[in-house]
Every structure is written in structure tokens, then in C-alpha cells.
Amino acid sequence: MKTIQFVKTNDCLACEVVENIIFDIIYEGNLPTYIDVQKDTCNDAQARISMFHTITVPLLIFRVDDKEVARITGSMPADFYKTVIDKFIEL
């Protein structure tokens, strides 16, 4: 089972962009049924540090069989996020 965990805050423009990319992938039907997407909103920086070991958002954590295989954090170009998500789906 593959999992994409998306962590965001309420006041983050980059988080909205990544959320829209994920929504578009799901809406277009490009997300296989064996990939789970989890979305968490975590506005408390201390909680993000204790749970995810970073305060930076947006944060995408990619897991295969509950083992973390990749992590993207911070503001990146939208195409970068889309490309990485698409490649994870293809694997």
C-alpha cells in the first residue's frame, strides 16, 4: 500500500497550491485505488516538530507499506510537486 501524507497550515499559499495539485490528480482519475492520500492541518509549529520533525510546510511524506521513502518540504515550484507525485504513482 502506498500513502501520500500532506501536511499544511491554514494560512499557507504554497499549501493551497499543493492541495489543488493533489485534488486535480484525484479528480482526473489518475490516482490508483492502492494509493491512499492523508491530509493533515497542523497550525501549531511545536506539534509539527514533534510529529514530523520539521516546522516547514507544505510537507509531503511518501510511504510504501508504512515505511517512509521520500519527503518534500517547503515552497517548491508547482511543477516539481506534480512531477514527484506522478513519479510516486508510477513506481
Residue map of PLM features:
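Thiol-based oxidoreductase modules, predominantly thioredoxin-like and allied folds used
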Residues: V7-K8, E19, N30-A45
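Local sequence-structure signature of Cys/Sec-based thiol-disulfide redox active-site neighborhoods
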Residues: M1-E28
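Short Fe-S-cluster ligation motifs
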Residues: T41-V57
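Solvent-exposed amphipathic alpha-helical surface segments
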Residues: I25, G29, F88-L91
